[in-house]
Amino acid sequence: MVARVERPQPNIFLIDNMVFVPGGTFRMGSDRHYPEEAPAHRVAVDGFWIDRTPVTNAQFDAFVTATGYVTSAERVPLAADYPGTPPEMLQPASLVFAQPKDSASLHDWRRWWELRFGASWKRPHGKDDPRGAQGDHPVVHVAYEDAQAYAAWAGKDLPTEAEWEFAARGGLDGADYAWGDEPMPQGRFMANTWRGRFPDFNSAADGC
C-alpha cells in the first residue's frame, strides 16, 4: 500500500518521505499476459507526489492507535454475507502465502495461498505463529477500504491504477518488468528493484 497527494501541505516530514513524479504519457496495460490487462493503451498522467516506500507496520500502527480502526481481516464475518458457511469458519482470517511442497501451477492461486485464522497486519503469518509484524516491514492483510481509511487519516489519497503503474515503471514504457523485459537478467532474481521512483515492485502484494 502506498499513498499519494497532488499538492502536499508545507510539512517537511511529509515532503521528506515522498517523491514527486512528473506527469507524462505511457503505454498502460499489456496485450501479452492476463486478459484483464488488455488492451494496452496510451494514458496521460498529471504530476503527483507519492510515498517513497510502501506504508510500514509502524505507520499503520500509529493510525490504528490514533483512531481505534479495525481492519477487515480482524472483523468477525457476518453469516448473512456468507450463507451456508459453517459457524466454525466465521472467524477473522486472511490469506497467507504458503509455498507448495511440490511443483504447482502459477495460475492456481489455491496452491500458493491458504486461509489462516487470526492472520492480520498484527500477525501476518496467523494467530498461531509467534512472529509478529516488524515495524519497518510493509503492512499487509489490508483491504482496499482499510487503505482508504489510512490514506484519509494521513491527509493523502491512494494512487490510481495509472499513477501506480506510471511510477513503478520508472520511465520504461511498455516493458514487462520494472527493470526491463527479461524475467531474470544475467541469471539474477529481481525480487525488488530500485530502478523506478521508489522500490515498490514486488515488496508486498499490492492491492491498489
Features from the language model and the residues they span:
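N-terminal pre-domain segments of enzymes
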Residues: 1-12
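C-terminal, low-complexity/hydrophilic appendages and adjacent surface loops
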Residues: 35-38
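GGW-centered surface loops in extracellular recognition modules
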Residues: 12-20
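Functional-site microenvironments in short loops/helix caps that host divalent-cation chemistry
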Residues: 20-21, 27, 32, 77-208
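Short capping motifs at secondary-structure boundaries
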Residues: 48, 63-72, 154
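Short active-site loop at a secondary-structure junction
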Residues: 42-55, 133-142
